[in-house]
Regions:
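Conserved aromatic-histidine-acidic binding/catalytic patches
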Residues: 30-33, 80, 145
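Short helix-to-loop capping/linker segments positioned immediately adjacent to catalytic or ligand/cofactor-binding
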Residues: 45-47, 103-110, 142-144
Length: 170
């Protein structure tokens, strides 16, 4: 009877983790909103927008949230002056619903975007919130043309039921 040969044991190879997709990336943070956690949240938000996951992006906002894009850099008040965007949560929902519509002719063909977020700093912190300032560059590709937008964004990030959300953004 032939003797069974033992195969040499292969060294253990660490299993590769599946890469996190934007929708799988956790938005939950520990109690403290530190710089690294805030930066990761902003990168997650940018990725959702670049991938066109607007419903997931909308889910990052609290029910009382607002989003303001001033028309001038030194604009201090969204009510007394003209703004590019000044939306509460309900208007954000309408905006997202319109973007999903096949009749959104202003986005035919759809824009492809790439956002870069940097120079993230925490301006103010408190119990369960942080006001975060960041710089951004957004490149839009559409109709064989490229447009570049840049600016400063302010986010008020809050923790609600252990989850980080946007209370306001401008």
């Amino acid at each position: 009877m032939a003797k069974k040969l033992k195969r040499p044991r292969r060294p253990a190879v660490p299993r590769r983790r599946r890469p996190l997709t934007a929708s799988a990336r956790p938005a939950r943070l520990p109690q403290r909103l530190d710089l690294r956690r805030c930066e990761q949240f902003l990168l997650h938000e940018a990725r959702l927008l670049d991938e066109g996951k607007f419903d997931d992006w909308l889910a990052l906002f609290t029910p009382e949230a607002w989003y303001w894009v001033p028309s001038e850099p030194d604009q201090a008040d969204p009510v007394e002056t003209v703004s590019l965007i000044y939306d509460d949560r309900r208007l954000l929902e309408t905006r997202v619903r319109r973007l999903a519509s096949p009749r959104m002719y202003s986005q035919e063909p759809r824009s492809r975007t790439s956002r870069m977020i940097g120079n993230v700093t925490i301006e103010e912190t408190g119990k369960g919130f942080a006001t975060v300032r960041s710089k951004f560059i957004m490149i839009e590709y559409r109709r064989e043309q490229q447009r570049l937008f840049g600016g400063t964004a302010l986010h008020r990030l809050v923790q609600t039921d252990g989850r980080v959300m946007i209370a306001w953004k401008h």
